[in-house]
Amino acid sequence: MTQVEVLVEDDRWKSINFEDLVTKAFYETLKRLGYSKTDYFISVLGCNDKKMRKLNLMFRSKDTSTNVLSWPSRERLRIVEGDHPKPLNPTLDAELGDIALAYETCLRESTHYSTNFASYVQHLTIHGVLHL
């Protein structure tokens, strides 16, 4: 059974049923990639811009918030800075990694693009999963 661990640090995420939304996006992404029968694990954080800014500074040396960040698991880390993570091995890679989404940035961007907020968050979750 695929597992999604969701941590919501900002209660505003609950307005779009964040846990169900990101879980569904993850399952559908795996299914479309042909991995529907394999066990995978992922962690998703719903945070605010302040937390995302700290994460972006810590991991990317950028002192600003962003909409989504993703980190492949240690087993799949790139060997050379800037390279893509190692290709997914369905028989070995159970833990894919972590994703974080920033509420204010996602809301601001969805408004800017005249896109439904929940749909935009789902899109960004898929984007994050594909980076793993």
Residue ranges and their predicted role:
Residues 1-122, 130:
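An acidic/histidine-cluster motif and surrounding catalytic segment
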